[in-house]
Regions:
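Asp-based, Mg2+/Mn2+-dependent phosphohydrolase catalytic module
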Residues: 2-23, 31-33, 63-76, 83-338
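Generic structural signal for secondary-structure transition and capping sites
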Residues: 47-48, 194
Length: 338
């Protein structure tokens, strides 16, 4: 990728328009055990809450992991879908005796030990079996989730427990590629019970609202790599959004998506000035500006072409995106679209 040492690349001015960033983690800030290029530079010194659908780690564990990768983060800067699931579950349960929400309720947790701890902290009594007739099943991602746990969850849900999933992401980005996400295992319980869970995480708007209030933000920007969760959730919350091309969603998916981000970028740092696009009949012609790393050029080409294609899609028209005649940089950028 182009680095700031390249004279062509400049820091994003997009981020300066906002007073807080609500930032996804997997695929946006890091992939597995490695930081995404540009993320540390882009986020440095900015008010941020890390809003993650990953429920397998506690806020403290997430903060420690980010710190080990060179980010300046406290546990208070992290909002996980496990936290959101506990809050949602408490609000769904009927505490007709007037007790504090969740205080007298029982929960069966499919997920990490940290999720069980968060449920306990939220006032739930965590049980180990469907035979104890839990009031709610809380389902979050953990590498330790197995057939026995999913079966207990299915038994509890069939017996009437409220079913709350931390998130419905079907895949989880890693350095090796896309792994099975929480939504894929939730689908097994849904198949066995016929019950669709309440989902606490993205793409619902709740997490974004909580994160913005946490910072007292008036102009928050939702940032992520997935259209169907990060961008859809930000849109649902009524916020501007930035889709970075460092994770799941690719250029061609963004070009024809129903979840249209306000901004598109290669990463949280690098930007190339001067790229333009214009419509000529049924063609969008991209002209290059400043040149640099091909991934950054590809993102700039998409950023200027996408609004024209979206408008055409709304009119029922089909446009083809091409490089301007003789523009080798634009041609290279479009060839890199995935």
């Amino acid at each position: 990728m182009t680095s700031l040492s390249s004279p062509a690349a400049t820091p994003h001015r997009i981020l300066d328009r906002y007073d807080a960033l609500l930032v996804d983690l997997d695929g946006t800030v890091f992939r597995g055990g490695a930081p995404v290029d540009g993320a540390r530079d882009g986020l440095s010194g900015r008010a941020s809450v890390y809003v993650t659908n990953n429920a397998s780690r506690s806020p403290q564990q997430v903060a420690e992991h980010l710190t080990s990768l060179g980010f300046e983060v406290d546990a208070a800067d992290v909002l996980t879908s496990a936290q959101a699931a506990c809050t949602l579950a408490a609000s769904l349960l009927d505490n007709s005796d007037g007790s504090e929400q969740g205080t007298r309720s029982t929960a069966y947790v499919v997920g990490a030990a940290s999720f069980r701890g968060l449920a306990t902290d939220a006032g739930f009594r965590v049980v180990d079996s469907a035979d104890e007739r839990p009031d709610v099943v809380l389902h979050g991602h953990s590498p330790e989730n197995n057939w026995a746990m999913l079966s207990e969850a299915a038994l509890a849900v069939r017996a009437g427990a409220v079913y709350v999933a931390s998130n419905l992401d079907t895949t989880l980005p890693s350095e090796r590629g896309l792994l099975i996400g929480n939504g894929s295992l939730v689908a097994a319980v849904v198949s066995a019970t016929g019950v669709t869970p309440h989902s606490a995480g993205k793409p619902g708007p709740a997490m974004f609202g909580v994160a913005a209030r946490q910072l007292g933000a008036e102009r928050p920007l939702a940032v992520g790599d997935r259209l169907d969760t990060d961008i859809a959730g930000g849109i649902a919350a009524g916020m501007d959004t930035l889709c970075v091309l460092t994770g799941v969603s690719g250029h061609r998916e963004i070009l024809h998506t129903m979840w249209r981000p306000t901004w598109i970028a290669a990463n949280l740092r690098d930007h190339l000035e001067g790229w333009t696009a214009r419509q000529d009949g049924d063609t969008v012609i991209v002209e290059s500006g400043a040149t640099g790393g091909v991934d950054v050029m590809a993102a700039e080409a998409l950023a200027v072409a996408a609004p024209l294609v979206w408008s055409a899609d709304d009119r029922g028209e089909d446009l083809t995106v091409v490089a301007a005649s003789g523009d080798s940089a634009a041609a290279e950028a479009l060839a890199a679209w995935r």
